[in-house]
A protein has these predicted regions:
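N-terminal pro-sequences and low-complexity stem/linker regions of secreted or lumenal proteins
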Residues: 1-462
Length: 462
């Protein structure tokens, strides 16, 4: 496509664990943006189509003020099945309250999964949705949690069906770094803290290599590098809430119980950096998407697109559908303000886009091609409705720093470490074991882990 030819740098920002209705459902509400073209929420407090019933009690979506939650929300494979509540061949999306009560044992009038945020708490996401494109039919690839969905994002395959504290297996020949290298495409990862890519099996040399740089270097790199030097693909990672050490960064990945405010600030900082140079911005495409819904309510049923279990996978029962919708925003001066993309997409839509750009075909690999034929479209579909010329205006983002209030009284209850937290801790230990010196140079915060301490000298002979 002609417009894709004008794009020189594709920037992908993947955040964590929010549904479309939780972050952007307000776009269609009369008391907020009142954008009837967006598949958001309509009269959520009274609309019976959204009611989650449990033991004779009905639970409705409600306006949730941003802030830290008591705990993470349920979103593993089994509980996502509960949330989507399949009845015969139809997903009713009526089990979110049920899953929450099963997971926590807590019965409250307004279970947090049913909450939706307002523009006041999502100012940057709302800004991008107003000034560029929002995709209201973008689904997590799989109805499960983070690790399988991120595996789909970066390879088109998932060899696991749940998040566990073990290296994430990779299907040979399909991982994004290998694919880009094979085609001579320059790429880079900017990470706030420990990179999520450290959790994948066999990526230590990448994660410790020159293509991985701290996000602190991004402003200077973006300003100093010419268009020819700038990577064609940039992945920007937040500070993950589940990382074992936070040193110099506030978690900003939007993963509950973390509030949305830090993630909104992070997204604003990225946008401000990308748009600082108007000429570079004309050649840039920004994708901001969440990896999965994180247990939050969404009223749109998933797509009936099954998954392929790759050879050597650690599970045997295939997925029958995608996961729920997630927030997805596409920004570029080639996109008109207020655009709403209705194309059905998931994270493999990013792989289709890269394949179109760098291989001349949307078929990144066999599984991505199969999903395309089943109805998953490329991000390039957004550009098909783009402008003939790039916009001369660069809309200014919200200026105020977003401060998320702490909504809890007293300290949160002590909880056992989640499997995601265990996975990050194990990845950090593996990275130190692989090459302690380079790991500490790349991720200096790891020095605070016991595994980073030097071995004591042997005792002197008596």
């Amino acid at each position: 496509m002609a417009i894709l030819d004008q794009i020189q740098t594709i920037v992908v920002v993947m955040l964590e664990n929010r549904s479309f209705d939780n972050v952007l459902g307000h776009l269609s509400m009369a008391r907020f943006e009142n954008r009837k073209g967006v598949e958001g929420l309509t009269d959520p407090e009274t609309n019976l189509d959204y009611t989650n019933f449990l033991d004779g009690q009905g639970y409705q979506p409600f306006e949730l003020k941003d802030g830290s939650l008591l705990h993470d929300l349920p979103h593993n494979r089994g509980l996502v099945e509960t949330q989507m509540a399949k009845l015969d061949s139809r997903y009713t999306m009526s089990g979110f309250a049920d899953a929450y009560f099963r997971h926590t044992g807590s019965r409250v009038a307004n279970p947090p999964p049913m909450g939706f945020l307002t523009p006041a708490d999502t100012p940057m996401s709302s800004f991008l949705a107003a000034q560029y494109a929002v995709c209201d039919q973008w689904f997590a690839p799989l109805p499960t949690d983070t690790q399988p969905n991120r595996s789909m994002t970066y390879s088109g395959y998932a060899s696991i069906d749940n998040t566990k504290p073990r290296p994430i297996p990779i299907v040979p020949g399909s991982f994004i770094f290998e694919w880009l290298n094979a085609r001579g495409v320059n790429w880079r990862v900017y990470h706030c803290g420990l990179s999520f890519f450290a959790l994948f099996d066999g990526l230590h040399e990448h994660v410790l290599g020159p293509n991985f740089r701290s996000f602190r270097h991004f402003p200077a790199d973006w300003e100093a590098e010419s268009a020819a030097e700038m990577p064609a693909v940039i992945f920007i990672e937040p500070e993950y809430s589940d990382s074992p050490i936070h040193f110099g960064w506030t978690p900003n990945d939007n993963h509950p119980p973390t509030a949305m405010g830090p993630g909104e600030n992070f997204l604003r900082d990225i946008y401000k950096l990308l748009t600082k140079d108007a000429e570079k911005w004309k050649r840039t495409l920004l994708l901001a998407v969440h990896d999965e819904h994180g247990g939050f309510f969404d009223h749109v049923p998933p797509l009936a697109i099954s998954s392929t279990i790759p050879s050597g996978a650690l599970y045997q029962v295939p997925f029958e559908s995608t996961g729920p919708r997630v927030p997805a925003l596409v920004a570029s001066p080639w996109i008109p303000p207020g655009m709403v993309s209705k194309e059905t997409m998931d994270h493999t839509s990013i792989l289709q886009l890269l394949a179109e750009k760098f291989a001349g075909t949307p078929d990144y690999n066999e599984e991505v091609a199969r999903r395309r034929k089943a109805g998953i479209q490329s991000v390039s579909a957004v550009l098909e409705e783009s402008l003939d010329q790039p916009r001369s205006d660069i809309p200014s983002p919200p200026a105020d720093i977003i401060v998320s209030p702490v909504v809890l009284k007293g300290a949160p209850e002590l909880q056992a470490e989640t499997e995601s937290q265990q996975a990050f801790a194990a990845a950090a230990k593996d990275l130190l074991a692989h090459d302690r010196k380079r790991a500490l140079e790349k991720y200096p915060e790891l020095v605070h882990l016991p595994e980073a301490q030097p071995e004591p000298p042997p005792a002197a002979p008596q």
